[in-house]
Amino acid sequence: MHCTVNGQPRELPDEITVEGLIEILGLASAICAAEVDQKIVPKRERSETVLKEGQSIEIVTLVGGG
């Protein structure tokens, strides 16, 4: 299935969840935020939110520093 992830076109497996995408990207779920079609997906809903063809997904990680 074709989606846009962080502004880049990407081929994803069918029936993948937001949590599954975070795992594929190699990110730590605890320190990132997810948005699908400009709507924030709460952490508790990531494993239940199945992505669909053509959606736009943004995954943002937190970075410490100073």
For each feature predicted by the language model, list its residue ranges.
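Ubiquitin-like/PB1-type beta-grasp interaction modules and other compact soluble beta-rich domains
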Residues: 1-65
